[in-house]
From Swiss-Prot:
Residues 1-24 form the signal peptide. This is Pregnancy zone protein. SUPFAM superfamilies: Alpha-macroglobulin receptor domain, E set domains, Terpenoid cyclases/Protein prenyltransferases. GO terms for molecular function: endopeptidase inhibitor activity; serine-type endopeptidase inhibitor activity. Belongs to the protease inhibitor I39 (alpha-2-macroglobulin) family. Disulfide bonds join C48-C86, C249-C298, C267-C286, C469-C562, C594-C783, C642-C689, C833-C861, C859-C895, C933-C1339, C1092-C1140. Glycans are attached at N55, N157, N382, N405, N412, N568, N881, N942, N1003, N1385, N1443. It comes from Mus musculus.
Length: 1495
């Protein structure tokens, strides 16, 4: 090291200006009280006091003052003479964030009092939310945990007013209130609907203070990736490098390489900031490379960089790489991306830590790091430091880590600041707009002089790096003392305290002997590093000199983010077989509660999780500012008295005082660590009485300001007195044979989500079964202890793997008579060759012939695969299972020229998959329903099952079911009431509303079980979520929501329907109030002056237009909805609506026309309103319109209405609108007054109602629903009301026997214990004659369901004209991949001007799947509102059809090759008039080998 010395100025002027006692030792009593300048309310804090030269016991008091009030924190706390200790205190709270604290020390002869500002911070407890995984599919269950701890990470039994789930549209879809965290943790879950809004959801936890903690997760339709594409390349490269090596690898989730084609695309894109006038020069520069992956699944390419013009500006300063890997055999292609920054800064210097202040006579020190452009340390290089303004120059050499410790002797320094610039290489100063030059960054730092009137100092030697928990760190302290002041002293006491997490953590003292006259030297303090000090601690040390001067220093230490609760998680081994038993061991502090999680690595590949980590936990701690500065708050100053700034003449020389001293002092050091110091010692630098703006020596810039401005790259200006901390740039087996077989069918995404309490020894264990997925599982845990607090485990892995396994490839469904190739692929991941036998289990359900000859065994060497195929022709209908087994054999035979080894464990892998085998033609269903009510007599019903002449052979099947409850069938099928799609806002309500009626009915009849309740509640939750997809921003709802087009208005009818349903569902699930309020407000704006409601939006059901006019029918419906919410009759909206209806009824009653539909709604509306007279008038009028058949009663629309076609022995099925209007009449009979219970109905009304019920019950389908949505909803409401009115809890039972003319006989027992149980039997004789006998006492509901397929027959009177054509798009002769287009033309040819909403249901030809983008694109057409892909069907929703032809097309592609392809049907039907339908068939254009379209 070499140094250039410059003369230093004397302190003469300062000496003359200082008070006379600055150099005179005294022994006056000295008090120091230390309190954090920011304190937490409700959390214990400490006030520390040290006394010097106090020869008596004194009393310490702390008083908090705010708003003219005083609160005693410490009252007359006795403090022994010459002691140093801390006393705890707690501030319960303050209405103001800034208050004052007064310290008073008094004794027999002493009194000291001072006041200073402090800030009170409300200590919000750290809270975090953990979900079981970061991404979910529609219909999955979201599981999450809420955890609360205090600032010491101990569990907090906190109660949160509300926890809720928020959708991407900020709708609240689920809510829990008053959630109490026993032991600091609570687990919750909720189901996503099968059709939720996709995007980012939030779990929101709201605290009592109103603060919200949010945790996000994503809902997305996804397929878990089988493998990951990894790009290995350097993150940064120098712009002078000529080659860039890139490696792309494919790795399965279970760790094995992916065979396939690797394609690399390497680009340097042009900068968007560059002008576009350079034409071709502005284009991106790209190169492409392609090659088969090697045996490690990788492709390595060394890219020449010359083509990318790295020295030229105007392009992005990075190289971007995209790698695609197409898996061999499947064609599955996944992508990975990577990038490499281009750097012209070939070296970087940075201070990792450096003194912020300097003290003359003590070494100024710091540490610098030298790295190259990649962040790699540069060792054994000379670096130069220059200290200004003195010009000192020093040379240091970096070590093997690129670090150099800098130490500068400051013995002769007197400047108010110093600046240190460290340089490795000088830069060539030249700038070119289009050309890059080599650049080397410097490290630049400024430090400020610490003022001491006696030139006495203490300084903490810098400690570099992060301190590990549990270690003892020796801290070296340098000191320099004024000999004149200390000459009579035998020792000096140094006091130190440690501040962590904003509070005083620990304290101590060190007595330094001065008997040897050692006024300059070093001593050490051992500091024990504890978890409570993390993540950063401040060490403050000070001493009080005999001249009353206080000298001090402070330093920040980075502490390892550790926890007192050490958590260890382990599996017995790193690899296990699928479906094997294992256990997860956890060890932590005794009696901890541990939360365990294990997730499929595939999920994390899809969406990497922001998992719990020490960093994320520590980030939750409430923050205190280091300095505790109070901006804009009055602070009681305790500066020294000012000194004169006038010129002084000495020995004939005139001295001008230096103004605006930029030095730091002891006070600023305490302030830098957020400590308020109350003392009578000298802690301030001199202050001149006159403010003087100009500082001539520095050209008008104050030294401190210059120090800030001068800090350049690599420096950081931090709290005064605390050294700056920088960031690093760098980122043998027993041969006993055991046959082991695995049958794999359990494939979860989250495997473990459990709470495990630990025993007194701190051990716990969870026994689990490894799922069947061959993948890597990532497991982690956190534990909570009341004593040691929170602890986190590291993430551990378990590979679920077996040395070989089997994969089956087969289609979803085929038509009887078709043949397909079943492929079984065996993968061997052992290091040696083995003999494998692959068998397909024989079954009478199919015929399987091996393809390419039959071999007893197959040889598969390490990391190879073998595919075995069978040509399969199904023989049975329905779900046909295929069971394939691969077994490793003990065999001495050679595999080619390689020896086979006998596996240590001979494994069998069995995979079971199914194919649905469907009959030809289209499916038809007929039902026969009857209500049988024997009263201690035997009733008998003879009936027969017949089949139509065009039935497809073998397709017929029939069942007979018995239920003791009229709603029993619906209860069994709450989510499957209709065999129709549910893809719009109204259809979704049929999944939602019946659950309310079922819950209310079972509650009222005291039959509700937990199982039914749980199921219905979950359906309500799911339906609520889905319905919000159809909500508009104004609170209204429409059939397709915003999906129907940006300008689609809200639908008045649907909004009323949703409003009523949400209001009624509130008693069962959480419904956000604003959804009800906003819908009602929107609906209110649609009410006209006459009380009627105007229509908004398109009515998809024409039946609503069948009344006098749309307005009356609609108004009646909305009035019913408002009354059922329920709103009182006195409410203005209801009162006005009833006026509208009364006016309409007056008009209708004078009319000669029969408005049955409208009258049915009016009757129910007046019944709900309690208007007996109007109800009676309407029911009397309706009675004249009734259709009376034997013991049943119903209503139908005027005119000759065509019934739904049925076989002669079945009752004709009524159209949807007639079921709906009949159900409304039934509701009117069952509602005499809204306030009266249903059971108070007259016997006359009940008698009429029972006749209506008999007719309605006969219209039910086999799932408990009816034809369409509205008839199902209203009819189930009416049936539930009737069921409640007639329910009796009888101990009697009914016996039902069904017999055929052959030998078949089956008896059912129905009683109060099993009345909700569905009892069913398959009928053997088709066709056949049967008799049903009923005896006992009570009512039973009987249903016979017959299903069969028929071949489509052209009908000249079809209500829809349907034309289908197919055209090949890609005719692959090999048959590996074929695509074709389906072109559909459709129009309405029925009797109405237009249809209702229409569904086009396109079934896929076997082995083909739709190309989803082409299906989605159909929604761009004006009349097509929505499309769905549902297994092997494409559903297209059309708003309405007229006689104008609507044409559209989409593409399909081959998924699995199938031979002898059969045609597939396309069905077009009216959603609300399901008897109006047309069916056509189409064939794949490859079926006959031609390339022409056919249908």
């Amino acid at each position: 090291m070499r140094r250039n010395q410059l003369p230093t100025p004397a302190f003469l002027l300062l000496f003359l200006l200082l008070p006379r006692d600055a150099t005179t030792a005294t022994a006056k009593p000295q008090y120091v009280v230390l309190v954090p300048s920011e304190v937490y309310s409700g959390v214990p804090e400490k006030a520390c006091v040290s006394l010097n030269h106090v020869n008596e016991t004194v009393m310490l008091s702390l008083t908090l003052e705010y708003a003219m009030q005083q609160t005693k924190l410490l009252t007359d706390q006795a403090v022994d003479k010459d002691s140093f200790y801390c006393s705890p205190f707690t501030i319960s709270g303050s209405p103001l964030p800034y208050t004052f604290i007064t310290v008073e020390i008094k004794g027999p002869t002493q009194r000291f009092i001072k006041k200073k500002s402090i800030q009170i911070i409300k200590a919000e407890s750290p809270v975090f939310v953990q979900t079981d995984k970061p991404i979910y599919k529609p219909g999955q269950i979201v599981k999450f945990r809420v955890v609360s701890v205090d600032i010491s990470f101990r569990p907090l039994n906190e109660t949160f007013p509300v926890v809720y789930i928020e959708t991407p549209k900020r709708n609240r879809i689920f809510q829990w209130q008053n959630i109490h965290l026993a032991g600091g943790l609570h687990q919750l879950s909720f189901p996503l609907s099968v059709e939720p809004a996709l995007g980012i959801y939030k779990v929101v936890v709201q605290k009592d203070s109103g603060k919200k903690i949010e945790h996000s997760f994503e809902v997305k339709e996804y397929v878990l990736p089988k493998f990951e594409v990894i790009i290995k390349m350097q993150k940064t490269m120098a712009f002078l490098e000529e080659e860039l090596p890139i490696t792309a690898c494919g790795v399965y989730t279970y760790g094995k390489p992916v065979p396939g084609l690797v394609t690399l695309r390497v680009c340097r894109k042009y900068s968007r900031y560059r002008s576009t006038c350079h034409n071709q020069n502005s284009m991106s520069i790209c190169e492409e490379f392609s090659q088969q992956a090697d045996d490690k699944g990788c492709f390595r390419q060394v890219v020449k960089t010359k083509v990318f013009q790295l020295r030229q500006k105007g392009h992005d300063m990075k190289i971007e790489v995209e790698a695609k890997i197409k898996e061999e055999g499947t064609g599955i292609e996944l992508t990975g991306i990577g990038s490499c920054e281009i750097a012209n800064a070939l070296s970087k210097l940075k201070f990792t830590k450096v003194n912020t202040n300097y003290r003359p006579g003590l070494p100024f020190s710091g540490q610098v790091l030298l790295v190259d452009e990649k962040g790699k340390p540069i060792p054994n290089k000379n670096i130069t430091s220059v200290v200004s303004p003195l010009g000192y120059l020093s040379i240091f050499t970096t070590d093997e880590h690129g670090l150099a410790n800098i130490s500068i002797d400051t013995s002769n320094f007197t400047a108010p600041f110093l600046r240190v610039v460290v340089t490795y290489k000088q830069n060539h100063v030249c700038y070119d707009n289009w050309w890059l030059d080599e650049f080397h960054t410097q490290a630049d730092h400024s430090a400020t002089l610490v003022f001491s009137p006696s030139q006495s100092y203490i300084q903490l030697e810098l400690v570099f790096g992060t301190l590990a928990c549990g270690q003892t760190q020796e801290i070296r302290i340098h000191y320099l003392l004024n000999e004149d002041i200390m000459k009579n002293e035998k020792d000096l006491t140094f006091y130190y305290l440690i501040k962590a997490r904003g509070s005083i953590f620990n304290l101590g003292s060190h007595v330094l002997s001065l008997e040897q006259g050692n006024m300059k030297g070093v001593f050490s303090l051992p500091i024990q590093v504890e978890p409570g000090m993390a993540p950063e601690a401040q060490l403050l040390i000070y001493a009080i000199l005999p001249n009353e001067e206080l000298v001090a220093d402070a330093q920040n230490f980075e502490i390892e983010k550790c926890f007192a609760n050490k958590v260890n998680l382990s599996f017995p081994s790193a690899q296990s077989l699928p479906a094997s038993d294992t256990h997860l061991k956890v060890k932590a502090a005794p009696l901890s509660l541990c939360a365990l999680t294990a997730v499929d690595q595939s999920v994390l590949l899809l969406k990497p999780e922001a998992k719990l980590s020490p960093q994320s936990i520590y980030n939750l701690l409430p923050g205190k500012t280091v300095q505790g500065a109070f901006f804009g708050v009055p602070v009681y100053k305790d500066h020294e008295n000012c000194i004169s700034g006038e010129d002084i003449t000495h020995n004939g020389i005139v001295y001008t005082p230096k103004h605006s001293l930029g030095d730091n002092d002891a006070h600023s050091i305490f302030q830098s660590v957020g400590i308020n110091i109350f003392t009578n010692s000298k802690i301030h630098k001199p202050r001149f009485c006159q403010e003087f703006q100009h500082y001539p020596a520095m050209g008008g810039v104050a030294p401190q300001a210059l120090a800030v401005a001068a800090s350049g790259p690599g420096s950081s200006f931090r709290a005064m007195g605390v050294p700056m901390m920088g960031l690093d740039y760098s980122d043998e087996i027993n041969q006993v044979v055991e046959v082991r077989e695995t049958v794999r069918k359990y494939f979860p995404e989250t495997w473990i989500w459990d709470l495990v309490p630990l025993d007194v020894s701190g051990d716990g264990e969870l026994a689990v079964k490894v799922p069947d997925t061959i993948t890597e599982w990532k497991a982690s845990a956190f534990c909570l202890s009341g004593t040691t607090g929170l602890g986190l485990s590291s993430t551990i892995s378990l590979q679920a793997f077996q040395p070989f396994f089997l994969e089956l490839t087969l289609p979803y469904s085929v038509v009887r008579g078709e043949a397909f190739t079943l492929k079984a692929t065996v993968l061997n991941y052992m290091s040696h060759c083995i003999q494998i036998r692959v068998d397909l289990e024989i079954s009478p359900d199919f015929l399987a012939v091996p393809v390419g000859g039959h071999e007893n065994s197959h040889c598969i060497c390490g990391n190879e695969r073998k595919t075995v195929s069978w040509a399969v022709t199904p023989k049975s209908l329905g779900e046909v299972n295929f069971t394939a087994t691969a077994e490793a054999l003990q065999s001495p035979e050679l595999c080619g020229n390689k020896l086979t080894e006998v596996p240590a464990l001979v494994h069998k892998d069995t995979v079971v998959k199914s194919v649905i085998v469907e009959p030809e033609g289209i499916e038809k269903e007929q039902t026969y329903n009857t209500l049988l009510c024997p009263q201690d007599t035997e009733l008998q019903d003879n009936w027969s099952l017949e089949l139509p002449p065009n039935v497809v052979e073998g397709s017929a099947r029939a069942t007979h079911s018995v239920l003791g409850d009229i709603l029993g069938s619906a209860m069994q099928n709450l989510q499957n009431l209709l065999q129709m799609p549910y893809g719009c806002g109204e259809q979704n309500m049929v999944l939602f509303v019946p659950n309310i009626y079922v819950l209310n009915y079972l509650n009222e009849t005291q039959q509700l079980t937990e199982a039914i309740k749980s199921k219905a509640i979950n359906y309500l939750i799911s339906g609520y979520q889905r319905q919000l997809n159809y909500q508009h921003s104004d609170g209204s709802y429409s059939t397709f929501g915003n999906h129907g087009g940006g300008n689609t208005p809200g639908n008045t009818w649907l909004t009323a329907f949703v409003l009523k349903a949400f209001a009624q569902a509130q008693s069962h699930i959480f419904i956000e109030k604003t959804h009800i309020t906003n819908a009602f407000n929107w609906l209110s704006m649609k009410q006209k002056e006459n009380g009627c409601f105007q229509q908004s939006g398109y009515l998809l059901n024409n039946a609503m237009k069948g009344g006098v006019d749309d307005e009356v029918t609609l108004s009646a419906y909305i009035t019913i909805a408002l009354l059922e919410m329920p709103l009182p009759v006195t409410h203005s909206a209801v009162r006005n609506a009833l006026f509208c209806l009364e006016t309409a009824w007056a008009s209708i009653s004078q009319s000669q026309e029969s408005h049955v539909y409208t009258k049915a709604l009016l009757a129910y509306a007046f019944a709900l309103a309690g208007n007996k007279a109007k109800r009676s008038e309407l029911l009397e009028s309706l009675n004249k319109d009734a259709v009376k058949e034997e013991d049943s009663l119903h209503w139908q629309r005027p005119g000759d209405v065509q019934k739904v076609k049925a076989l002669s022995f079945y009752q004709p099925r009524a159209p949807s609108a007639e079921v709906e209007m009949t159900a409304y009449v039934l509701l009117a009979y069952l509602t005499s007054e809204s306030s009266r219970p249903t059971r108070d109905l007259s016997s006359s009304d009940l008698s009429t109602a029972s006749k209506i019920v008999k007719w309605i019950s006969k219209q039910q389908n086999s799932h408990g629903g009816f034809s369409s949505t509205q008839d199902t909803v209203v009819a189930l409401q009416a049936l539930s009301k009737y069921g409640a009115a007639t329910f009796t809890r009888s101990q009697k039972e009914v016996l039902v026997t069904i017999e055929s003319s052959g030998t078949f006989s089956k008896t059912f027992h129905v009683n109060s214990g099993n009345r909700l149980l569905l009892q069913e039997v398959r009928l053997p004789d088709l066709p056949g004659n049967y008799v049903t006998k009923g005896s006992g006492s009570g009512c039973v509901y009987l249903q016979t369901s017959l299903k069969y397929n028929i071949l489509p027959v052209a009908d000249g009177k079809a209500p829809f004209a349907l034309q289908v054509n197919t055209l090949p798009l890609n005719f692959d002769k090999a048959g590996d991949h074929r695509t074709f287009q389906i072109r559909i033309n459709v129009s309405y040819t029925g009797e109405r001007p237009s249809s209702n909403m229409v569904i086009v249901d396109v079934k896929m030809v076997s082995g083909f799947i739709p190309m989803k983008p082409s299906v989605k694109k159909l929604q761009d057409q004006p009349n097509i509102q929505r499309t769905e892909v549902n297994t092997n069907h494409v559903l297209i929703y059309i708003e309405k059809l007229t006689n104008q032809t609507l044409g559209f097309s989409f593409a399909v592609e081959q998924d699995i090759p199938v031979k002898n392809l059969k045609p597939a049907p396309i069905k077009v039907y009216d959603y609300y008039e399901t008897d109006e339908f047309t069916v056509e068939e189409y064939s794949a254009p490859f079926s006959d080998g031609s390339e022409q379209g056919n249908a």
